[in-house]
Amino acid sequence: MSLTLRVLAPDKNVFDGIAEEVILPSTTGLLGILPGHISMVTAIDTGVLRVRTNGNWDSIALMGGFAEVESDEVTVLVNAAELASEINASDAESEFEQAKTEFGQLEGQENSTQKIKAKEMLNRARARVQATKSA
């Protein structure tokens, strides 16, 4: 048995294929999907989607969205996504370090718009780094 996985971003079709297993970064934690999974809809957090195809694991950095599981089909609609193989690991590491620095400089500004944006950039940078390390 297998799953059909589609990962769609506004600007591109990131992944469309057959998978043996999918691990989604939902807003309530990691969610494993196998063939025969119950139908559901869940919110997707910024993080790394893992997909097993032909016994091999691949990673996709996701930037928030929604996922639907229905009849062995998993459709993931996200704000943005990148295959780990398309991410330059050293660039991702530099962006992560820069995002950490910028976020740290905003300490004490708990509810400022600037700090919220910096936190979002930090989460995106972290997801890109994690995707390259788990590829």
Curated annotation (Swiss-Prot):
Q: Name one Pfam family in it.
A: ATP-synt_DE_N
Q: Which gene encodes it?
A: atpC
Q: Which organism is it from?
A: Prochlorococcus marinus (strain MIT 9211)
One GO molecular-function entry: proton-transporting ATP synthase activity, rotational mechanism
User: Which GO cellular component terms, listed alphabetically, does the Swiss-Prot or TrEMBL entry include?
Assistant: plasma membrane-derived thylakoid membrane; proton-transporting ATP synthase complex
Q: List the disulfide bonds.
A: none
Is Membrane a UniProt keyword of this protein?
Answer: yes
Q: Which NCBIfam families match?
A: ATP_synt_epsi (TIGR01216)
- Write down the Gene3D superfamilies for this protein, in alphabetical order: F0F1 ATP synthase delta/epsilon subunit, N-terminal, Helix hairpin bin
> What SUPFAM superfamilies does the entry give?
Epsilon subunit of F1F0-ATP synthase N-terminal domain
Q: Which domain of life is it from?
A: Bacteria
Q: What is its main location?
A: membrane
Protein name in the entry = ATP synthase epsilon chain
Q: What is the lineage of its organism?
A: Bacteria, Bacillati, Cyanobacteriota, Cyanophyceae, Synechococcales
Q: Which residues form the signal peptide?
A: none
Q: Which UniProt keywords apply?
A: ATP synthesis, CF(1), Hydrogen ion transport, Ion transport, Membrane, Thylakoid, Transport
